[in-house]
């Protein structure tokens, strides 16, 4: 087990060695890919979570495998691959993980041992609208956060998050390109999430998002209500996203005060679950993904991969293409997908000073729920409201097929750039995601 002080020392030294990236500071050519944790590298940095807007060029990121409708159960680790081994072949890997997933009683347990930073699993394919359901039991305890979200490479996000000290509340939330707005959060009331399996559902169309629990609508958000007149755009999730399942320590003592308060307080690393099992855990039984299957963009999945043709990162800049998605090695990038091929084929390791797997060499935010670092209130106070699940229908049909802004596909800058300042101050996602792999590798 890695002590917290040791972990932080590793991260501090690593942050000096490798370049950070943002909307204002792109990655250098030698390490061109900006991971979802805000650091530059090659290999896995160029795969899931690579933000093309912050990378050396749009082409630095490897194209994203298109949506595939599928039902997943978790009776074994087949199809679940470590992010240290995944090279972009979604036909061989359904899920990519950091941390320590465990198969138990036909569930995959996302585990978090004492003083660790948890586990995340992300789908290898991307949904561009559609429907996703996950059946699971959350973890429990103050400071312990379970999450089921959709997260795009340009940081569009649709969330379910669960605070372990509030077991009758599911927090629903959404973000456009990582822009924080705590008024977007709404609570859904339900029975004990640790004791009971519930089926959580996100129905996402170009016109609205519906959150359902056990088939009952808990919340609906219409795109028509998200217009930003200043930026001349819809602040609505609209780009291809991976499904992400996670367990993370919102109540880690080193986290910001706002995050700890939102998470219900500091984690008890000597709790009943730690003593009896050796870890906190969330139990996921199944995930069902249904693609949107539009006949014309947005929302198609007729090709092999998605890529962006503009730094705007909106739905009218997404191209459904036949471009390849598989790297030859962890030295490769979107512009040189065969780098390191000879070394990989021979089984040797090519020399490189570049970071190749996000999280192994640095910390950061990025991609698994919101860190709530600007919010000093508790989760029950920070929500803009609550809603009890009610019976009503949800449909993925009848979309207008909207195109962002004025509908152009220009690669020039637009009024969207007025939001850059807000985006720059946001570290999206859980505090753990960027450092899970450090713990995993150091424990080997």
From Swiss-Prot:
It comes from the Eukaryota. A lipid is attached at residue 415 (GPI-anchor amidated serine). This is Crh-like protein 3. Its main location: membrane. InterPro entries: ConA-like_dom_sf (IPR013320), GH16 (IPR000757), Glyco_hydro_16_CRH1_prd (IPR017168), Glycosyl_Hydrlase_16 (IPR050546). Coiled coil: none annotated. Residues 57-271 form the GH16 domain. Residues 1-19 form the signal peptide. It is a lipid-anchor; GPI-anchor. GO terms for cellular component: cellular bud neck septin ring; fungal-type cell wall; side of membrane. It is found in: Cell membrane. The keyword Glycosyltransferase applies. The active site is at 157 (nucleophile), 161 (proton donor). Residues 416-444 form a propeptide. One of its GO terms (biological process) is chitin metabolic process. It comes from Botryotinia fuckeliana (strain B05.10). Its EC number is 3.2.1.14, 2.4.-.-. GO terms for molecular function: glycosyltransferase activity; hydrolase activity, hydrolyzing O-glycosyl compounds. Disulfide bonds join 27-34. Forms homodimers as well as heterodimers with other crh protein members crh1 and crh2. Dimerization may be necessary for the transglycosylation activity. Belongs to the glycosyl hydrolase 16 family. CRH1 subfamily. Keywords: Cell membrane, Cell wall biogenesis/degradation, Disulfide bond, Glycoprotein, Glycosidase, Glycosyltransferase, GPI-anchor, Hydrolase, Lipoprotein, Membrane, Signal, Transferase. It holds the Pfam family Glyco_hydro_16. It catalyses: Random endo-hydrolysis of N-acetyl-beta-D-glucosaminide (1->4)-beta-linkages in chitin and chitodextrins. The gene is crh3.
């Amino acid at each position: 087990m890695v002590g917290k002080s040791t972990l932080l020392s590793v991260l501090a030294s690593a942050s000096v060695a490798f370049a950070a990236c943002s909307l204002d500071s792109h990655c250098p050519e030698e390490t061109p890919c900006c991971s979802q944790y805000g650091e530059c590298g090659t290999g896995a940095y160029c795969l899931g979570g690579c933000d093309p807007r912050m990378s050396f060029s749009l082409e630095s990121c490897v194209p994203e495998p298109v949506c595939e409708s599928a039902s997943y159960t978790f009776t074994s680790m087949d199809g679940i691959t470590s992010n240290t081994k995944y090279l972009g072949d979604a036909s061989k890997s359904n899920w990519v993980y950091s941390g320590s997933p465990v198969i138990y009683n036909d569930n995959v347990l996302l585990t978090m041992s004492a003083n660790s930073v948890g586990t995340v699993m992300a789908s290898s394919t991307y949904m561009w609208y559609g429907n996703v359901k996950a059946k699971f039991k959350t973890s429990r305890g103050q400071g312990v956060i379970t999450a089921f979200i959709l997260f795009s490479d340009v940081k569009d996000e649709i969330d379910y998050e669960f605070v372990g000290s509030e077991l009758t509340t599911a927090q629903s939330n959404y973000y456009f390109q990582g822009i924080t707005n705590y008024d977007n959060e709404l609570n859904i009331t339900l029975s004990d999430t640790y004791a009971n399996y519930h089926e959580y559902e996100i129905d996402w169309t170009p016109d609205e998002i519906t959150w359902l629990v056990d088939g009952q609508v808990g919340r609906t958000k219409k795109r028509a209500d998200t217009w930003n007149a200043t930026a001349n755009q819809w602040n609505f999730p609209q780009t291809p996203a991976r499904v992400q399942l996670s367990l993370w320590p919102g109540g880690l003592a080193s986290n910001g005060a706002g995050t700890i308060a939102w998470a219900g307080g500091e984690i008890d690393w000597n709790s009943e679950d730690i003593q009896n099992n050796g870890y906190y855990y969330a139990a996921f039984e199944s995930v069902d993904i249904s693609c949107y299957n539009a006949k014309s963009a947005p929302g198609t999945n007729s090709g092999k991969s998605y890529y962006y043709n503009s730094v705007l990162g909106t739905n009218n800049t997404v191209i459904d293409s036949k471009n390849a998605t598989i790297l030859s090695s962890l030295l490769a990038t979107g512009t040189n997908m065969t780098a390191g091929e000879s070394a990989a084929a021979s089984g040797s390791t090519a020399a490189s000073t570049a970071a190749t797997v996000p999280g192994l060499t640095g910390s950061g935010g990025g991609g698994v729920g919101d860190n709530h670092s600007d919010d000093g209130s508790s989760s029950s106070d920070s929500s803009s409201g609550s809603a009890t699940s009610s019976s009503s229908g949800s449909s993925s049909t009848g979309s207008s097929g909207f195109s962002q802004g004025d509908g152009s596909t220009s690669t020039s800058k637009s009024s969207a750039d007025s939001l850059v300042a807000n985006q720059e101050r946001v570290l999206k996602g859980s505090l753990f995601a960027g450092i899970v792999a450090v713990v995993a590798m150091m424990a080997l």
